[in-house]
Amino acid sequence: MRIACLPLSLALLLVPATASADFTAFLGSTTTPVNRVVTGASIGAGLVIVGFEFEYARTSEDLPELAPGLRTYMFNGLLQTPIPIAGMQFYGTMGGGVYHETLSERSETNFGVNVGGGVKISLAGPLRLRIDYRVFTLSGDPLHSKPQRFYAGLNLKF
């Protein structure tokens, strides 16, 4: 049985994987310390199961609520289902990068990491709906070190 599996395993390793890329523009909500709008975009590339993306997101500050503005610039790795299941491709992600937090005259720029997951739902052709949840851990001296974010966005696969 093992001898029969060896040629099949070698054949699978030698078959070239198709690369794909995608772009997402998103709108969502950050819940820390109060609900506020977050906007952003990401561009990524991937093979069958492993992918990578760069993402930028922005949340405006809300002075009356003492909620800081936050900009994140993150590079993330993704593990995803190799094929869509019922038109949905699930993924988990983690990564790191730089953040900039501001509230009035106070500002903090430092390193942050994030972990999360989501799903890309096929709509028509290369157009998909992307739903994503992330938890950030911000180093340094931010006002809120564990902000959370939920978003939905239009994703174009190319």
State where each predicted segment sits.
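Extracytoplasmic loops and strand-loop junctions of Gram-negative outer membrane beta-barrel proteins
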Residues: 24-26, 99-101, 137
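Gram-negative (and chloroplast) outer-membrane scaffold detector with strong preference
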Residues: 44-113, 121-125, 129, 150-158
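Solvent-exposed loop/turn segments connecting transmembrane beta-strands
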Residues: 29-39, 62-69, 103-108, 139-147
